[in-house]
C-alpha cells in the first residue's frame, strides 16, 4: 500500500534502479480503473507477483496464497488537502483519528480473509507507533495484540 500514486512511482523507479530482479515481480496499479486488470494478472500469474498501489486498501479480496504479506508504506490518514476533510478534522479531531484507524484496520484485513488464512503486515511509517499509543482505544483488541510485539521491538531498537 503506497500513500499515493506519486510515491508508488518513486518506489517502482527505486526498485528498477537498485533491485531489477524484484522490480520484474511488481504489478503497478496505475489508477483505480486499472485495479481489476491488475488483480486478474496477479491471480493468473504462475510466478509470484507483488501489487503496488494506493488503491488496494479496500474492496479487494486476495485470500490464501494471493496475499501472504503486505507493506503499508504510509499511515492512511485522510487527505487534509481536501477542504471537506480539513474542515471536518478541524471541527472534530477524533473523527480524523477514527477514519485513520478504520482505514488502517481495513488495510490490515486484506491479508486475512477467513479463519484459516494468514499473512504478515509491515507498516513502515514512523507515525504508526505514535498513532497506536495515542489512539489505542480506537483500535480493536486483536489489532493491538498483533501490533504490540512489533512496537516493543521497535522501541527496544530505538526506532
Q: Where are the model-predicted features located?
A:
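Conserved helicase motor "Helicase C" RecA-like lobe of SF1/SF2 P-loop NTPases
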Residues: 2-32
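A short acidic (Asp/Glu
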Residues: 8-14, 60-65, 132-135
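Charged/polar, solvent-exposed surface patches and flexible loops
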Residues: 10-13, 17, 37-44, 106, ...
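A generic structural motif
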Residues: 23-38, 145-159
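N-terminal targeting/trafficking signals and adjacent low-complexity tails
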Residues: 122-159
Amino acid at each position: 500500500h503506497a500513500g499515493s500514486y506519486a510515491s508508488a512511482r518513486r518506489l517502482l523507479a527505486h526498485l528498477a534502479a537498485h533491485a531489477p530482479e524484484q522490480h520484474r515481480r511488481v504489478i503497478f496499479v496505475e489508477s483505480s480503473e486499472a485495479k481489476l486488470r491488475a488483480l486478474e494478472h496477479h491471480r493468473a500469474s504462475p510466478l509470484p507477483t507483488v501489487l503496488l498501489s494506493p488503491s488496494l486498501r479496500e474492496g479487494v479480496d486476495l485470500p490464501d496464497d494471493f496475499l501472504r504479506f503486505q507493506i503499508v508504506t504510509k499511515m492512511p490518514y485522510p487527505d487534509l488537502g481536501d477542504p471537506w476533510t480539513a474542515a471536518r478534522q478541524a471541527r472534530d479531531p477524533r473523527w480524523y483519528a477514527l477514519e485513520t484507524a478504520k482505514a488502517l484496520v481495513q488495510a490490515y484485513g486484506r491479508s486475512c480473509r477467513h479463519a484459516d488464512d494468514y499473512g504478515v503486515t509491515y507498516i513502515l511509517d514512523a507515525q504508526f507507533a505514535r498513532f497506536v499509543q495515542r489512539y489505542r482505544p480506537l483500535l480493536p483488541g486483536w489489532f493491538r495484540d498483533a501490533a504490540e510485539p512489533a512496537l516493543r521491538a521497535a522501541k527496544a531498537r530505538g526506532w
